[in-house]
């Protein structure tokens, strides 16, 4: 089976004495919805940026493939990485919209890798492409704002516009880096519901880094947890316990849990045991 995302032995050092990523290996299947959990500085955002090909790993370190095509190997981007990136939608924490441009124009930017270069430079789109953008905005529930400046939208609406951009891009993999970090609870619910719906209806892999444990458990069947750049847990979100999360988050845990995770749940019928690695935070 070709994995939607495959990471093999990836390391990244920003300083000689500290690795942001430490020999990370994981596979994500097409159609999975996976949460990345971990305390601030654990490596979640860094991992997503490597998968997207925005940055490279240490020289001689690891390999990343998306849908079987190489993004980077041994610290060097693949020659055709631009083509691979065309299949990767990225939702940023800070929305990454141009406030002075209409919402529809921001959404159609998702097509730029698939249109002739001269049209991408001039931002000229066919009527059929504009309609596809309007359809994407309708899918996320903000088509009424299509021709307003992006700066007039609320934070939640701007994030939904960013999700619409991945739809017109026809992304096969969606990476979302803390997409609800600055949003109110209702906006957060709408954004996560949209990502979950896209995952279900389009069968694309969605990987979302989160700080909210309860949100991860509600929307993501699988969790990958990082600590100090290492994968310390990879398994069902339903199998997480408060003790595991206290070990993962340390002093932040009580603020994050809010009684959303049982102390020691028994595995529900049909819920597999954690796979690949076990929680061993004392050694991490």
From Swiss-Prot:
<dbReference type="GO" id="GO:0005524">
    <property type="term" value="F:ATP binding"/>
</dbReference>
<dbReference type="Pfam" id="PF00005">
    <property type="entry name" value="ABC_tran"/>
</dbReference>
<keyword id="KW-0547">Nucleotide-binding</keyword>
<keyword id="KW-0813">Transport</keyword>
<comment type="function">
    <text>Part of the ABC transporter complex PhnCDE involved in phosphonates import. Responsible for energy coupling to the transport system.</text>
</comment>
<keyword id="KW-0472">Membrane</keyword>
<dbReference type="InterPro" id="IPR003593">
    <property type="entry name" value="AAA+_ATPase"/>
</dbReference>
<keyword id="KW-0067">ATP-binding</keyword>
<dbReference type="InterPro" id="IPR012693">
    <property type="entry name" value="ABC_transpr_PhnC"/>
</dbReference>
<protein>
    <recommendedName>
        <fullName>Phosphonates import ATP-binding protein PhnC 1</fullName>
        <ecNumber>7.3.2.2</ecNumber>
    </recommendedName>
</protein>
<comment type="similarity">
    <text>Belongs to the ABC transporter superfamily. Phosphonates importer (TC 3.A.1.9.1) family.</text>
</comment>
<dbReference type="InterPro" id="IPR027417">
    <property type="entry name" value="P-loop_NTPase"/>
</dbReference>
<keyword id="KW-1278">Translocase</keyword>
<comment type="subunit">
    <text>The complex is composed of two ATP-binding proteins (PhnC), two transmembrane proteins (PhnE) and a solute-binding protein (PhnD).</text>
</comment>
<keyword id="KW-0918">Phosphonate transport</keyword>
<keyword id="KW-0997">Cell inner membrane</keyword>
<dbReference type="InterPro" id="IPR003439">
    <property type="entry name" value="ABC_transporter-like_ATP-bd"/>
</dbReference>
<dbReference type="InterPro" id="IPR017871">
    <property type="entry name" value="ABC_transporter-like_CS"/>
</dbReference>
<feature type="binding site">
    <location>
        <begin position="38"/>
        <end position="45"/>
    </location>
    <ligand>
        <name>ATP</name>
    </ligand>
</feature>
<dbReference type="GO" id="GO:0016887">
    <property type="term" value="F:ATP hydrolysis activity"/>
</dbReference>
<dbReference type="GO" id="GO:0015416">
    <property type="term" value="F:ABC-type phosphonate transporter activity"/>
</dbReference>
<keyword id="KW-1003">Cell membrane</keyword>
<dbReference type="InterPro" id="IPR050086">
    <property type="entry name" value="MetN_ABC_transporter-like"/>
</dbReference>
<dbReference type="GO" id="GO:0005886">
    <property type="term" value="C:plasma membrane"/>
</dbReference>
<feature type="domain" description="ABC transporter">
    <location>
        <begin position="5"/>
        <end position="253"/>
    </location>
</feature>
């Amino acid at each position: 089976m070709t994995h939607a995302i495959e990471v093999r032995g990836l390391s990244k050092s920003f300083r000689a004495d500290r690795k942001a990523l430490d020999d990370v290996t994981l596979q994500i299947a097409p159609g999975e919805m996976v949460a990345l959990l971990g305390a601030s500085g654990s490596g979640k955002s860094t991992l997503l940026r490597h998968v997207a090909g925005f940055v490279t790993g240490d020289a001689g370190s690891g390999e990343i493939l998306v849908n079987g095509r190489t993004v980077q190997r041994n610290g060097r981007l693949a020659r055709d990485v631009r083509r691979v990136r065309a299949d990767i939608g990225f939702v940023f924490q800070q929305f990454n919209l141009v406030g002075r441009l209409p919402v529809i124009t921001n959404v159609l930017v998702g097509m730029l890798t698939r249109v002739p270069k001269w049209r991408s430079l001039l931002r000229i789109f066919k009527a059929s492409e504009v309609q596809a953008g309007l359809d994407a905005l309708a899918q996320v529930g903000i088509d009424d704002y299509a021709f307003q400046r992006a700066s007039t939208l609320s934070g939640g609406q701007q994030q939904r516009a960013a999700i619409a951009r991945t739809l017109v891009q026809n992304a096969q993999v969606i990476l979302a880096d803390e997409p609800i970090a600055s949003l109110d609870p209702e906006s957060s619910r709408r954004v996560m519901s949209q990502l979950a719906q896209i995952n279900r209806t389009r069968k694309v892999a969605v990987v979302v880094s989160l700080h909210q444990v309860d949100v991860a458990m509600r929307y993501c069947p699988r969790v990958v947890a990082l600590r100090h750049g290492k994968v310390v847990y990879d398994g069902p979100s339903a199998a997480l316990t408060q003790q595991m999360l206290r070990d993962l988050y340390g002093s932040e845990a009580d603020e994050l849990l809010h009684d959303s995770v049982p102390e020691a749940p028994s595995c529900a019928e049909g819920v597999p045991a954690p796979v690949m690695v076990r929680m061993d935070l004392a050694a991490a």
